[in-house]
Each structure stands twice: as structure tokens, then as C-alpha cells.
Amino acid sequence: MSVNDDKIIYLDLEFVSRKYEQKIGGDPAATITKQQGGNAGINALFAHAGVTTQESRTFSVTSRQMFQSIWNQLIDEYDNFSEFENYSGTKVLWLEGELTLGEWKSSGSKEAGYQFYQLNHNGERTAFVANQSYLAPGFSEIFGASSALKGNIGIPVKCLARVMWHVDDAKNYVACPYVIVEQS
């Protein structure tokens, strides 16, 4: 089964390329570029003082092609969300529910708070700590939009995310999404 590309709301490119390499194997046409920079002028065999290294990979297939080729394997590899316990590590799980907007702000504050995407699922809430550049066009712009455009948001989705912890006071989970796909 494949996913309609138009239904992809969020796609973490780092996660997808890492999983693609793991599941399919390295892309024989991949190009790996390493860049070093620094200001200290010291570069020993094992020690770097003030030196940074950045690695980039270029594949002969697009991230969406990678995602399509591993979709079924991702479905099989990860469990559906059923329970989570703080202080026992993170879990990568499938969650299904309604994608909406959430907001954190001080009690009684009239100023706008921190807005984020939130998943409502089985009576639970999960706040997504997301990289806005991985959102489909239009989805990242909603945060700066008028409040008149932010009502009635409830998109049915299936999401693969790393659940990191539960905030007891706020009664919600916090997760880093890897994939969010609209269900219809």
C-alpha cells in the first residue's frame, strides 16, 4: 500500500533518509559531503578545538520516493500507541487522531502564547515539537495567521512520532513527529 503524496502533512527528511538507508541499504548513487570549519587552527587526529563538522548526503531519489518505498515497513515496525510511562525512555509509536492547534500560555494571560500542532487521540492530547520546514506548504503559515482562520481545525491523521514524556500538570504528552499523513 502506498500513500497519496497529497496526504502527507509532515515528513522528517532526516528520519526518512536514515530509515531508507537502514531498510533498503545505501543508495549507490549517494554523494556524501563533509565540511569542516573552525577558528582555532588546531586539528589533531582525535581532538578538534573550535572545529565543526557538517555532513550532507545527496541521494538519486527524492525524500518522497524514499518514504513511499519504506511506508509498509514503517507500518509493520512500530507499535500503535497504547501506554507510555515517564522516566522509562522514549518510544517511537503510531498515533491516530485529530490534528489541531494547541497553545500554552500563562493562566489568565491575555497575550498570545506558544502555538503548536497537537494530536487529540483516544481522550489524550499530544503536543508536537516539530520542525516547521518539514510541514507541507501552508501548514507552517497558520501560526502567524489571524485567529479567525484557526477555528474548527480537526484533521484526521495517522502519525509516527517519538513520544518523549507526559506533562502531568498539562495532562498531555510531548512528542517529536516523524511522519503525519492525513486519513480520509
Each language-model region and where it sits:
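Membrane pore-forming effector domains from diverse proteins
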Residues: 1-28, 54-117
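Weak global preference for isoleucine
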Residues: 8-9, 24, 32, 42, ...
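Short, cationic, amphipathic peptide segments
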Residues: 29-57
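Intrinsic-disorder/low-complexity loop/linker signature
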Residues: 45-46, 89, 123, 171
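Long, helix-rich, hydrophobic modules that act as membrane-proximal anchors or helical bundle/coiled-coil regulators
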Residues: 94-184
